[in-house]
Amino acid sequence: MKYRDLREFIALLEQRGELKRIQQSIDPYLEMTEIADRTLRVGGPALLFENPKGYDIPVLCNLFGTPQRVALGMGQEEVGALRDVGKLLAFLKEPDPPKGFRDLVEKLPQFKQILNMPTKRLSKAPCQEQVLQGDDVDLATLPVMHCWPQDVAPLVSWGLTVTRGPCKSRQNLGIYRQQVLGKNKLIMRWLSHRGGALDFQDWCQAHPGERFPVAVALGADPATLLAAVTPVPDSLSEYAFAGLLRGHKSEVVKCLSCDLEVPASAEIVLEGYIEPGETAPEGPYGDHTGYYNEVERFPVFTVTHLTQRDRPIYHSTYTGRPPDEPAVLGLALNEVFVPLLQKQFPEIVDFYLPPEGCSYRMAVVTMKKQYPGHAKRVMMGVWSFLRQFMYTKFVIVCDDDINARDWQDVIWALTTRMDPARDTLLIENTPIDYLDFASPVSGLGSKMGLDATNKWPGETQREWGHPIVMDEAVRARVDTLWNELDIFANDKDAQ
């Protein structure tokens, strides 16, 4: 699916019946959340609120409200094709040199995709068609959603934040929520291990007391947004990866106030700085956990310039108890993670992050077990391989005869193949999401690994059970009789 910017993507969704325009006046205060939530829970379309109450800028919600739309945003027609995106990422993370001519021919598509990686800088860009600066900047003109009754203030939710560390050539793109604090101020909620926060820490060490340049793009194209939430290798720019997804180079433009580059086709861009030491209490907000989070201090982002397209569109979302849009994104990105893990751990058959577990707090892994203790090695591998799994509290490991995505299968394995004392691994004092109020200390808690695999000699002294399986000849015989038996005839008559 080819598109160049958010507007082209919206048009393509509309052609497919995947976008609904809403003409009624809908309030960004709570009403949009309720409508978007009801729509997402039944797999409904993206929503374009054309007449937000009190504003003249349309609001786009539920853009990634189904895994299929996430796949389309990544340039794929089917969710299953996201495995190919994962294979490409695995290749970029650790490229294997061709082993011969035939292997070179097979790898040519990957090498051709890499040609789309460099960015293209434009001298003029749609995102700078209108320019406001200084006292003319007023965030109150944007229809920023106030999502839940006890939220402290309106919240920018899809802000693509662009930063660069003092010793880095590549820019970092990240999605961080931002509380509206005033006319030209937001609170930048980035966790300490995220790219933007690390760039800021490095800047403060290299340039103590100096302002840290930041830009935030609202309404960037889907490929760039999705690249920002995908585990791209540290050596690869998210802009470059977005070019791979999109099939053509990412077009960027230099900010008016600094050297950072922003997506040329973004609907709205906020430029400004963070003053070292300037922080403010952020929250509470209803979060993806289904609870209001605690209040914590984060840096303040001061906006000096607001640039935008003519007749801009404001892109927004809400977070709440799954399913919400982050949970849907997690479900789709799950397919990207599988090939990455399999390249490092070929014994892994499948990997599943249940959306009910906030899409990262629990993982189910199926594997081809090869030796005693193998399941524990896989647990450790999951926790340590990607930063995205640093906050995963529970890892369940099963054999490959179990369907990782079927709870009936997983629970059967847990209850028949596990001894709680022998097969439970507990690790204390590990990094935990500070939003996880179940941990005894903010940001620090425990992890649990559950070995639900069949036990090998050395792991048990008992004779292990043999699964019940019907004789194949009998199964074949019943297959030939099945239609003739017409066992469900009464059900058909009732219909």
Curated annotation (Swiss-Prot):
Residues annotated as binding prenylated FMN: I175, Y176, R177, R189, W190, L191, R194, G195
Pathway(s) served: Cofactor biosynthesis; ubiquinone biosynthesis
Active site (record annotation): D287
Catalytic function, reaction form: a 4-hydroxy-3-(all-trans-polyprenyl)benzoate + H(+) = a 2-(all-trans-polyprenyl)phenol + CO2
Binding-site residues, Mn(2+): N172, E238
GO CC terms of this entry: cytosol; plasma membrane
EC number: 4.1.1.98
Keyword Cell membrane among record annotations: yes
A molecular-function term among this protein's GO annotations: 3-octaprenyl-4-hydroxybenzoate carboxy-lyase activity
A Gene Ontology BP annotation from the UniProt entry: ubiquinone biosynthetic process
Keywords for this protein: Cell membrane, Decarboxylase, Flavoprotein, FMN, Lyase, Manganese, Membrane, Metal-binding, Ubiquinone biosynthesis
Annotated membrane topology: Peripheral membrane protein
Pfam families attached to this UniProt entry: UbiD, UbiD_C, UbiD_N
Cofactor remark: Binds 1 prenylated FMN per subunit.
Metal-binding as UniProt keyword: yes
Cofactor: prenylated FMN; Mn(2+)
Cellular compartments annotated: Cell membrane
HAMAP family in the record: UbiD
Function per UniProt: Catalyzes the decarboxylation of 3-octaprenyl-4-hydroxy benzoate to 2-octaprenylphenol, an intermediate step in ubiquinone biosynthesis.
PANTHER family xrefs: 3-OCTAPRENYL-4-HYDROXYBENZOATE CARBOXY-LYASE-RELATED (PTHR30108), FERULIC ACID DECARBOXYLASE 1 (PTHR30108:SF17)
Subunit structure comment from the entry: Homohexamer.
Family (UniProt): Belongs to the UbiD family.
Identification of the protein by name: 3-octaprenyl-4-hydroxybenzoate carboxy-lyase
Organism field: Edwardsiella ictaluri (strain 93-146)
